[in-house]
Amino acid sequence: MQARAVRRTALFAILLLLAASVFIQPSFAMRRETLKLHTAAQGEHLINVEITETDEERAQGLMFRTHMPEKSGMLFFYKTPRDITMWMRNTYVPLDMVFIRKDGTVHRIEAGTEPLSETIISSQGATVACLELAGGEAARLGLKPGDKVDHPLFK
């Protein structure tokens, strides 16, 4: 009798997890590409990125991730220049947010954002993209405002 209750509880938990997974957009569904950073300080760096293409992917972003590998990130791209605003809700790792102009020029970097913060982080100018990297990665790569990002989206 007790074994049956344990099995029933386990089955219920599995079904609950499966049902919840339907509502979470898996990150592997996002397009993955490589972009090139041209830094004045350290030259070129290749970065593997996931590119958000829909409002749902942008809303999900890097939420609930517990690790961000070096030289990888997520690129939030918008077709028209705007003051991009971001936050760290449900994001467990510190990030560097690199705001990029239409021509691929790095406009501004917000380094070491605070995990789980709902403070709004602004590009503070007309930009078309935000590249999120692991916290400290922009400094390790020597990335600064004025450096260039090379990817077909910025052509």
What are the roles of these predicted feature ranges?
Residues 28-155:
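Compact, glycine-rich, soluble single-domain proteins
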Residues 6, 21-24:
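N-terminal twin-arginine translocation
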Residues 2-13:
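Bacterial N-terminal signal peptides that target proteins for export
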Residues 11-22:
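Bacterial N-terminal signal peptides
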